[in-house]
Amino acid sequence: MLTKCASSSDPFMDWCKPSRSRNKRFDSVIKAFGFIQTFGEACIYKKVSGSSVAFLILYVDDILLIGNDIEFLDSIKGYLNKNFSTKDFGEAAYIVGIKIYRDRSRRLIGLSQRTYLDKVLKKFKMDQAKKGFLPVLQGVKLSQTQCPTTAEGREKMKVIPYASAICSIMYAILCTRPDVYLSISLVGRYQSNPRVDHWTAVKNILKYLKRTKDMFLVYGGDKELVVNGYVDASF
């Protein structure tokens, strides 16, 4: 885990430049060393040399280096130190709100967002709520017919942070909690005109996340990748 502080040539002037200019400079410097920007994600770069592979992930001024060859990674860090003033924090343990756990004996990496979920629960005043067993309660049916049809009903819902709660949960889904993807997709349909019933469903998802906030996403372990697909007939 590295943090990029400034240009070694002229730190003050370099960091007075707009963020876009700094990003363009970093992009050109890292590509000159053989890194290729990935097509799907502009902040991820890849470099391959023989059997050695390295990924560089840039988030604002923080850099996460991943690779299968320590000497290869050291050469990359040396190159970065020549072009930028950097600080090496060692093995990555926490980045963008995600806690990283390792079990090297079993070749496992776990990603947890407990701290982030605690903040979300507190933000929406659900930190003292009861824990939910499932993200979607059995028998609950949501539909457009439940949406407010009067100005009074819509005005009442304006004080409810409906869309904000959904966006907060979506970040967890994208990073470590795909298990609530279906439930959030159901309540997300009513963001333009939600009713109390829809908000109750959102709070139920938060209750479930409160009960399961210690769960984390685990990668690795099995040598063979087995993919299971599921179809939701109601979609």
Language-model regions, residue ranges each:
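Long, low-complexity, charge-biased intrinsically disordered regions
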Residues: 1-235
